[in-house]
């Protein structure tokens, strides 16, 4: 999985588990629908920490809890990569 898709996977998984549609998440998190759509579509490769924090709060999680998942924790960076 590409690094930029890790957050997309996390958001989609949490939405599915909690029965929350993306447009509802936008409202709950006070993140613009277009911003969230761009993240989920992979157009925004590196979402701002403030945006991720708002999304975490919408899921009733701390930012640390939101970022604590296997795909991110186990990610290995390519030595040649600037990601």
Region roles according to the model:
Residues 38, 45, 67-83:
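Short, charged recognition helix plus adjacent turn
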Residues 5-9, 33, 48-52:
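Short alpha-helical elements of helix-turn-helix
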Residues 1-21:
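A short, Lys/Arg-rich alpha-helix, primarily the initiator
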């Amino acid at each position: 999985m590409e690094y930029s898709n890790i957050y997309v996977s996390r958001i989609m998984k949490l939405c599915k588990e909690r029965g929350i549609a993306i447009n509802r998440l936008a409202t709950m998190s006070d993140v613009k629908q277009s911003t969230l759509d761009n993240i989920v579509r992979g157009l925004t490769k590196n979402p701002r920490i403030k945006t991720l924090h708002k999304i975490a709060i919408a899921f009733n999680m701390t930012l640390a809890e939101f970022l604590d998942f296997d795909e991110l924790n186990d990610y290995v960076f390519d030595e040649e990569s600037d990601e």
